[in-house]
Amino acid sequence: MSDVTIVKEGWVQKRGEYIKNWRPRYFLLKTDGSFIGYKEKPQDVDLPYPLNNFSVAKCQLMKTERPKPNTFIIRCLQWTTVIERTFHVDTPEEREEWTEAIQAVADRLQRQEEERMNCSPTSQIDNIGEEEMDASTTHHKRKTMNDFDYLKLLGKGTFGKVILVREKASGKYYAMKILKKEVIIAKDEVAHTLTESRVLKNTRHPFLTSLKYSFQTKDRLCFVMEYVNGGELFFHLSRERVFSEDRTRFYGAEIVSALDYLHSGKIVYRDLKLENLMLDKDGHIKITDFGLCKEGITDAATMKTFCGTPEYLAPEVLEDNDYGRAVDWWGLGVVMYEMMCGRLPFYNQDHEKLFELILMEDIKFPRTLSSDAKSLLSGLLIKDPNKRLGGGPDDAKEIMRHSFFSGVNWQDVYDKKLVPPFKPQVTSETDTRYFDEEFTAQTITITPPEKYDEDGMDCMDNERRPHFPQFSYSASGRE
């Protein structure tokens, strides 16, 4: 299977992710699952930079006649976040050809993965939840919804919600991401959820949120993730207005270390913004993976809908030139600019004007900024992702070598040997002084407990449950 060939190619209309208009793209579907789009028909198959590049492996396909006839949607789970891409073609026959070709490639890749796992000595990976239990608990009881108090809605989106919870037994706080099963079960295609939850379990880095448990109910999949209590970086920055360059260097280095780790695993984080950065009790960074928008934002003037925070969008995302790792370095540039300058590099309440600034405007700096800081931010905020600092083949190493980070020992960063410039005033992991008071005092009801048996699993769950074998997971053996 080393020879990757083209299965199907042709013109399709792709709907913009942020600015919801349709753009013509020439797409190639390949045997390795890559589905790549260009503005022009490529004369040379190995054009270096496709505008759109995603994989149809483990995807779900849906057909719809809205917002245009002959539309099809590709949906897949990236970590615990559901992402969708929308396309349309001129005729039902054309749509049928594309969807059949995509499904055939996805099915073949799935069979190959199953064969690999069956041959592999580590095929017990499916039992990862059981394997990785704390050896001291011989009769481990699976986690259920009844094991947690539900405190506050942290985020909400089309596919589910994220709730701050407290584990009753330990008093520890977690973020529980709850996805509706019906949006991720299409026919029998659920392998992607299982595979992605495995990726999350295997993702271990000191500055990334880790997965503590996962389990399922009748109609939901639940991911229970670390939630640190040193407060959001946004909260600390609002209180102090700006951070010193030294303090920013410390946080920036930890973020670079985490993104380097993700990129080495072929994962683009794509959602770096101040609100997704938290501090642990010692003052180290934690990048969250709660992955839900704070609801769609509608611009009344244009009726175009945005998901998330448009101020952080990279130029290539806005132009719908699908993006690679360099999108994360733009995000790093925006958050480090905010830390050192006390404001966003580009801002306008009117989204159309904001997008124009992001795409066209030169960046301005306060006079107080050092030349190294200006050089770093200028490099990270270059509009063209291929010329951006970190946009080359060396990725994070390019940023690590920049003079702003000279003197930083990157192994010490990873090992948490550097002393944090600020230590949150918390006494333990359950100290809630940086949480909103309104929700530490009360709980919220998510599901009427009587709907579940004592195991937290609905008795009527028989026909839905087999879709998600071995979904339960506990990380207690890995700490």
Swiss-Prot record:
GO molecular function: ATP binding; protein kinase activity; protein serine kinase activity; protein serine/threonine kinase activity
Positions of modified residues (N-acetylserine): S2
Catalysed reactions, as listed in the record: L-seryl-[protein] + ATP = O-phospho-L-seryl-[protein] + ADP + H(+); L-threonyl-[protein] + ATP = O-phospho-L-threonyl-[protein] + ADP + H(+)
Post-translational modification: Phosphorylation on Thr-305 and Ser-472 is required for full activity. Phosphorylation of the activation loop at Thr-305 by PDPK1/PDK1 is a prerequisite for full activation. Phosphorylation at Ser-472 by mTORC2 in response to growth factors plays a key role in AKT1 activation by facilitating subsequent phosphorylation of the activation loop by PDPK1/PDK1.
Main location: nucleus
One protein family per Pfam: Pkinase
Top EC class for this record: transferase
Lineage top rank: taxon: Eukaryota
Cystine connections: C59-C76, C293-C307
Residues that bind ATP: L154, G155, K156, G157, T158, F159, G160, K161, V162, K177
InterPro entries, per database record: AGC-kinase_C, Akt3, Kinase-like_dom_sf, PH-like_dom_sf, PH_domain, PH_PKB, Pkinase_C, Prot_kinase_dom
PROSITE patterns, per the entry: AGC_KINASE_CTER (PS51285), PH_DOMAIN (PS50003), PROTEIN_KINASE_ATP (PS00107), PROTEIN_KINASE_DOM (PS50011), PROTEIN_KINASE_ST (PS00108)
Residue ranges of the region described as Disordered: 458-479
Description of activity control: Two specific sites, one in the kinase domain (Thr-305) and the other in the C-terminal regulatory region (Ser-472), need to be phosphorylated for its full activation. IGF-1 leads to the activation of AKT3, which may play a role in regulating cell survival.
UniProt effect for mutating S472A: 67% decrease of activity after pervanadate treatment
Gene3D superfamilies associated with the record: Phosphorylase Kinase, domain 1, Pleckstrin-homology domain (PH domain)/Phosphotyrosine-binding domain (PTB), Transferase(Phosphotransferase) domain 1
Domain Protein kinase: 148-405
GO cellular component, one term: ciliary basal body
Phenotype when changing G171R: In a glioblastoma multiforme sample; somatic mutation
Domain AGC-kinase C-terminal span(s) in chain numbering: 406-479
Tissue distribution: In adult tissues, it is highly expressed in brain, lung and kidney, but weakly in heart, testis and liver. In fetal tissues, it is highly expressed in heart, liver and brain and not at all in kidney.
Positions carrying Phosphothreonine: T305, T447
Glycosylated residue positions: T302, T309, S472
Function, as annotated: AKT3 is one of 3 closely related serine/threonine-protein kinases (AKT1, AKT2 and AKT3) called the AKT kinase, and which regulate many processes including metabolism, proliferation, cell survival, growth and angiogenesis. This is mediated through serine and/or threonine phosphorylation of a range of downstream substrates. Over 100 substrate candidates have been reported so far, but for most of them, no isoform specificity has been reported. AKT3 is the least studied AKT isoform. It plays an important role in brain development and is crucial for the viability of malignant glioma cells.
Free-text domain note: Binding of the PH domain to the phosphatidylinositol 3-kinase alpha (PI(3)K) results in its targeting to the plasma membrane.
Protein name: RAC-gamma serine/threonine-protein kinase
Native source species: Homo sapiens (Human)
Organism taxonomic ancestry: Eukaryota, Metazoa, Chordata, Craniata, Vertebrata
